[in-house]
Amino acid sequence: MRRVLLATLMAALPAAAMAADAEHVVEARKGYFSLVALEFGPLAAMAKGEMPYDAAAAKAHASDLVTLTKYDPSDLYAPGTSADDVKGTAAKAAIWQDADGFQAKGMAFFEAVAALEPAAGAGQKELAAAVGKVGGTCKSCHDDFRVKR
């Protein structure tokens, strides 16, 4: 009986480790996007007139976003980390089923953020236009690859 129990436990260890790894990947992914939101939020608020436009602050937030886009997020999208696999994530399995489409959405985001940086310090009107483009890339990706909550 002990051997059966031991064999069962030994067989379960890799599955438990994989589950823990998947949960860590999801937490890291959430952390990355929390940083994106932290930097993008004030830019969106300035663009909408919800807070006063501040060229220096806008440039700093935009620069930080550019820095975040230089991070290779591939480790944040390990197979087995969709909403079908792990609780607490909104990532659709479509991310892995349509990897090319997902990457194209990511590249559109990176390009929009690159265009945001020079616009951020140019004035509220210029910032608003660039923020709209970045926000559009976010929405486009969420529409296709994020579970609606």
From Swiss-Prot:
Instruction: State the PROSITE patterns in the record.
Output: CYTCII (PS51009)
Q: Which Gene3D superfamilies match?
A: Cytochrome c/b562 (1.20.120.10)
Q: Which Pfam families match?
A: Cytochrom_C_2 (PF01322)
Which key words tag this protein in UniProt?
Electron transport, Heme, Iron, Metal-binding, Signal, Transport
Q: Name one GO molecular function term.
A: iron ion binding
- Gene Ontology CC terms: periplasmic space
Q: Which residues form the signal peptide?
A: 1-19
Q: Which GO terms describe its biological process?
A: electron transport chain
Q: Where are the transmembrane segments?
A: none
Q: Which residues bind heme c?
A: 29, 89-90, 138, 141-142
Its subunit composition reads:
Monomer and homodimer.
Official protein name in the record: Cytochrome c'
Organism name: Cereibacter sphaeroides (strain ATCC 17023 / DSM 158 / JCM 6121 / CCUG 31486 / LMG 2827 / NBRC 12203 / NCIMB 8253 / ATH 2.4.1.) (Rhodobacter sphaeroides)
What high-level taxonomic lineage is stated for the organism?
A: Bacteria, Pseudomonadati, Pseudomonadota, Alphaproteobacteria, Rhodobacterales
